[in-house]
Amino acid sequence: MAKVLVLKSSILGDYSQSSALIGHLMSHWQQQGAQMTVRDLAADPVPVLDGEIATGMRGGDNLSPRQQQVLDLSDELIAELKSHDTLVIAAPMYNFSIPTQLKNWIDLIARAGVTFTYTETGPKGLLEGKRAVVVTTRGGMHKEGASDHIVPYLKTVLGFIGITEVEFVYAEALNMGPDATAQGLLEAKTALDSLTA
């Protein structure tokens, strides 16, 4: 049975197109017997990385209460990620990039010596053998264009921690009129239906 960790990051709640598409995929995969864990990074945000937190992420004996709390949360998030086979990320495009809420999660799980390490031949990810599916929604048309910073960024950061099998599902033109919206969502759902857990 596949164990799937789902990350939602839209700030739009019930109006979120990316969350609706994630729900479609979850229903599809649950019928296949997948076990799902959902973390809504907008409804339950993680702290923003700052100087105090960055220093505390290195560990040590003299951490402030805040540093220890965030380090414990980082450990929890990493353990959660490690315990799942597949990572599903809802990544709506906000101003050509991912939501802040998703970036904050990445900042807490990308840790030297824990999810990646440095070797004589360069960095090596420590979370190998996992798969990621990214569902990305956009108001306009950005796929494979210079304005799409989501795909190269997520490919890079996921690959850096060892997750190199990454599939992207796009829902585009969602702010370009009812017909374009319907077509964009239909194409995304069709792509999601072709994926197996």
Swiss-Prot record:
Cofactor annotation remark: Binds 1 FMN per subunit.
Binding of FMN, residues: 10, 16-18, 93-96, 137-140
Species per Swiss-Prot/TrEMBL record: Shewanella denitrificans (strain OS217 / ATCC BAA-1090 / DSM 15013)
Protein family: Belongs to the azoreductase type 1 family.
Catalysed reaction equations from the record: 2 a quinone + NADH + H(+) = 2 a 1,4-benzosemiquinone + NAD(+); N,N-dimethyl-1,4-phenylenediamine + anthranilate + 2 NAD(+) = 2-(4-dimethylaminophenyl)diazenylbenzoate + 2 NADH + 2 H(+)
General function of this protein: Quinone reductase that provides resistance to thiol-specific stress caused by electrophilic quinones. Also exhibits azoreductase activity. Catalyzes the reductive cleavage of the azo bond in aromatic azo compounds to the corresponding amines.
Keywords: Flavoprotein, FMN, NAD, Oxidoreductase
Protein name: FMN-dependent NADH:quinone oxidoreductase
Claim: Iron is one of the keywords in the record: no
Cofactor(s) named in the record: FMN
Taxonomy, superkingdom: Bacteria
Top EC class, one word: oxidoreductase
InterPro entries hit by this protein: Flavodoxin_fold, Flavoprotein-like_sf, FMN-dep_NADH:Q_OxRdtase_AzoR1, NADH:quinone_OxRdtase_FMN_depd
Assigned EC number: 1.6.5.-, 1.7.1.17
A molecular function GO annotation: FMN binding
Complex and partners: Homodimer.
One Pfam family linked to the record: Flavodoxin_2
Transcription is among the record's keywords: no
Gene name per UniProt: azoR
